């Protein structure tokens, strides 16, 4: 057999063997967390990681934004044609709010987060997805994307006054963005579990999520 013929056959053999090994691995377990900025998602995600015996990877939109050059985004109030920036508005009560504006490159990065998540799930990695889906429609897109996997969808709520206080104290958030997200984020969608990061401790919420995930996996 010539070397040229042998190499493709060898590659096919390797890929076939890998597929057999992958099929023997446990199916990926996924926890999808959706909540407004400053609601405590990252703290919760890290606590969940530490609580499981099996490793879970922590993915999120903030991590994807860290891939981007700083100059492409504008978090100070100006317009960023390609990346992320803020769009000023007023809510129904007249309060000033700021919506996230995503330019074409930012939209590609949002889609990249989804593609990375699917790729890792297809390789049987357990995932905790830490998201800021700004509408119920975006959550429904995730549901469609991950429909072939065991996913626990968790909505995170926190009283508006608490979000706004955290927003002010952090100093790295646009004042008014928490209010905008609070008003629209959980509309027109549903979750397997809703938790309040203000009313319950992180440990209590971790226990609730793990219990709900176990019940879902048994169905």
Question: Where are the language model's segments positioned?
Answer:
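Hydrophobic anchor at the beta1->P-loop junction of P-loop NTPases
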Residues: 33
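ATP-binding Walker
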Residues: 39
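Small-molecule kinase domains that catalyze NTP-dependent phosphoryl transfer to phosphate-bearing small molecules
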Residues: 160, 165-211, 215-219
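Walker A/P-loop
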Residues: 42
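ATP-dependent NMP and nucleoside kinases share a basic, alpha-helical "lid"
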Residues: 117-171
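P-loop (Walker A) phosphate-binding loop of NTP-binding proteins
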Residues: 36
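Conserved substrate/cofactor phosphate-moiety recognition/catalytic segment
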Residues: 50-108
